[in-house]
Structure formats: structure tokens, C-alpha cells
């Protein structure tokens, strides 16, 4: 399995390949090869900055001679008008790395900003905000890093690091008890130590999951606030609980106040708006 650094290197290589192709002919035709310059990253709206470390890797991978002065680090609140970094390099390098760096930082900062709003919304409760697998193909590690920078927590990274029995698994497997039993048989056969979470859609499934046992967390899928409170009381701390499905910024605190341990929010990565910023020449 590829490491995070290897996945990010592949992403950077692919992004440069699709953007530059056989050459940035606009830059090559009008900028002298050895011309030097300086650009700064300007924040154009308030938010949480994210992607600084990955941006540094973009610059270093394209041109190791690029000099980056970081003024604001990942996870820091920024205001409109703040300068996050200054980069001194060949002008050709500045121009050819500009868009990829901005695409990464705007996306990651947008995710971190939205995540932070949800986290702040839950202050005073015990509930943690989780992301989901509803990420942009190829960008999952980047987007999940941004969630953590914004103060959220990562759910499973992929299909390999946790067992999550969802409705389709349960239905195809012939029910909750069969699904959990097969999980344990599989994990024992493969010598794997993975946590098991199961999704339940109603109180009958909740009762069956609890009676069966052998699980770490129960996901309450599309439960109302009232039913969530009832379910949490029934679970009584025997298993971790997670709310998921149809939860919005306006309703998330109501669910948290039911006492769930986690709330997963797909909107953190699938419906986010990038944070506005620019990379402009400076003195």
C-alpha cells in the first residue's frame, strides 16, 4: 500500500502533467529563462488556512531552487488581506506552479474552514465531527488532511482500515447477525485486527446489533433527533455511537446534545466552497 507521501507525489505529478503538458508556451514565449521574481499568497476572505505544507512540496518538486517564506501556518485563522507566504524564484517557476498551488490551497482551506465551523458549533458537547469517503477521486488524503487541520476527525480512510457494515452489506448478507458473524470469521482467518462498525436503520436492527455484540460502534442512519436520543439511551455507553444521514449545520447541535460520540458529515468534502486567495507578483 502506498504511503501518504507517495500518494501526494503521484497527485502532484499528475496535476503538473495535465496542466503543463508539453510546455507552458505562454510563459516560455514571453519570460526570459533566468528572470527572477517574487510572489505572495494573498488571502481574500476569512477562514482557516490549510495546504501550506503541500504547497511547499509542489514548489520543491517543480523547482528545488524556489525559496518559500511561510508567514502563516496550517490551521491558523486568516483574515481578508493576510499574506500567508512569499515565494522567490525564477519567474517561469512562479507562473507554472501558481495554479496547482492555488487549487490545492483553496480546496484544502475551504474544507478546513467549513470543518472548523461545524467543530465550533459543537463546543461544549462530547461529540466529534467526522468526515466520510465522499471525497474527490484521487484527492482523499489531501481532503482528509484538511478536515484534521480544521479540527475534525477522520473516519476510515478507505475500505481497508475498518469494517463498516452498511445497509447493502447487511441486506446482501442476510441480516445483521450473519454479517457480524462473517466479519469475525474473516478477520480471524486473515489475522486482521480491525474495528467493526455497523449501520442500523431502526430500533429492531439496533436491538439485534446489540444482542449480537462483537462490534465497536453503531451508526444511527437517518434517525430523527428524538429517536437518536432514545437510541443513545438504549445503547447506554456499551458501544460508541455515530449519527449520520441528513444532518445539517442547523441541526447538528441538536444531534450532538443527544449524547452521540460522533457525527459524520459528508458535506465537509463533497459540497465545499474553496477559500478565495490569489498569488500575485510583489516587490
Give names to the regions the model predicted.
Residues 278-283:
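Active-site loop ensemble at the mouth of alpha/beta enzyme cores that anchors a bound cofactor
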Residues 1-212, 217, 226-234, 239-242, ...:
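Acidic/glycine-rich phosphate/pyrophosphate-binding loops and surrounding catalytic core
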Residues 249:
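Cys/His-rich Zn2+-binding cysteine-cluster or related metal-binding knuckle/ribbon modules and their
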Amino acid at each position: 500500500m502506498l504511503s501518504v507521501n507517495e500518494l501526494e507525489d503521484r497527485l502532484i505529478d499528475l496535476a503538473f502533467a495535465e496542466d503543463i503538458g508539453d510546455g507552458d508556451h505562454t510563459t516560455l514565449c514571453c519570460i526570459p529563462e533566468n528572470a527572477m521574481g517574487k510572489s505572495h499568497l494573498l488571502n481574500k476572505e476569512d477562514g482557516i488556512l490549510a495546504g501550506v505544507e503541500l504547497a511547499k512540496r509542489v514548489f520543491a518538486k517543480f523547482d528545488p531552487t524556489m525559496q518559500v517564506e511561510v508567514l502563516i501556518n496550517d490551521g491558523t485563522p486568516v483574515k481578508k488581506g493576510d499574506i500567508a507566504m512569499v515565494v522567490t524564484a525564477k519567474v517561469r517557476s512562479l507562473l507554472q506552479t501558481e495554479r496547482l498551488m492555488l487549487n490545492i490551497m483553496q480546496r484544502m482551506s475551504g474544507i478546513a474552514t467549513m470543518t472548523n465551523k461545524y467543530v465550533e458549533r459543537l463546543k461544549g458537547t462530547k461529540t466529534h465531527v467526522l468526515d466520510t469517503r465522499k471525497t474527490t477521486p484521487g484527492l482523499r488524503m489531501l481532503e482528509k488532511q484538511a478536515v484534521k487541520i480544521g479540527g475534525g476527525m477522520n473516519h476510515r480512510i478507505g475500505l481497508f482500515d475498518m469494517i463498516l457494515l452498511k445497509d447493502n452489506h447487511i441486506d446482501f448478507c442476510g441480516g445483521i447477525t450473519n454479517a457480524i458473524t462473517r466479519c469475525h470469521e474473516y478477520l480471524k482467518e486473515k489475522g486482521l485486527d480491525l474495528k467493526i462498525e455497523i449501520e442500523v436503520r431502526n430500533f429492531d436492527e439496533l436491538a439485534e446489533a446489540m444482542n449480537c455484540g462483537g462490534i465497536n460502534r453503531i451508526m444511527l442512519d437517518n434517525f430523527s433527533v428524538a429517536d437518536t436520543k432514545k437510541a443513545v439511551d438504549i445503547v447506554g455507553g456499551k458501544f460508541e455511537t455515530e449519527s449520520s444521514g441528513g444532518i445539517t449545520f442547523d441541526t447538528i447541535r441538536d444531534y450532538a446534545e443527544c449524547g452521540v460520540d460522533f457525527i459524520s458529515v459528508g458535506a465537509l468534502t463533497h459540497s465545499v466552497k474553496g477559500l478565495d486567495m490569489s498569488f500575485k507578483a510583489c516587490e
